[in-house]
């Protein structure tokens, strides 16, 4: 029996939302192919995955599927449900998935010491081992190095059910997906191919729609002008008719010819007003907003208020060694960072990059308010705290931060009204708050994790110009 997933006119709103997050979404997800779910942070990508897996029920519409469904979450804080069963299973399927995704047999008891990249591979291996008919993956490429992404791509290409994937990695989506569902709240549009192909098609359609709207606007202006001319002519004629009507008929007008002429003129006047009204109606229809045309918001942030620390070094630590657990040690030399240095920390998953950053951060030589630090992962409790702190800001600083959030591609009103901002939105809040304070030191651990595709390009451009 064929496995599939079908959305029919599906709408969804969280309690308290003034408008639905998703509205009238109709889409078909076939077996044997992957569908990319593409949209800005907060557009409803995770919500759609949860609807697909049955973790949420639609407010309106129906979702039809055959078989089982599995949703693999974004976060890797805790082991996934069924972790012990998976690691204690020795059948061919479990062994194959652990081998394919490089899951070590010793990982069963040391989740807390695994890197986030290792946790992500383990999470996906378990999901594939379940062999669900519908598999929904939320940011599976987060934390993975190039080797890990290649391994993941190979593993997902062996999956034969109906797959849905949310990812900020454009190249990964292009290589894996046969179609992409683009979310522009509350609407959704399915396009064939990967995200690059779909975006190009969307660009062409938007260009055509704007050209059509501009042409219609020109026609509307001409019709409105013609309507005004008709009305003015009708008003002038009506005034003349009124004056004639007020005159007495000639004494010799025994057959009523004069009165019939006046009545005829009145009829023409009425027709002139009718024509004017019809032209105005046509003009209004042509000038009406086109719902298919999206509003383009200005994107991009700049560290305009950033400065340079007035000291020789913003970090100066002696050589040291860090315990990575499981008998592993990371030895580092003396480390110094000057105010203008740009440093990339590279290495495979599990080698201690994040551990080193956590060791160095308490030793930086800049005031706390001048440090912009975005960690690799932010817990749900910490996310809620950050969101509540944001809403408590006074109007002026809140306006500054939300302007920057808007320029990172999220809608401020929707974000402030949300009770559960997405991980990507939380990272945007941290980035915007840091930019607004004018940082002297910027530390980012996997900065593109959880960010939507347009937002990734904004920090790249800003960091290239940052003075610190």
What are these regions (language model features)?
Residues 1-209, 303-468:
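ABC ATP-binding cassette signature C-motif
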Residues 60, 84-97, 182-297:
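Extended, highly charged alpha-helical segments
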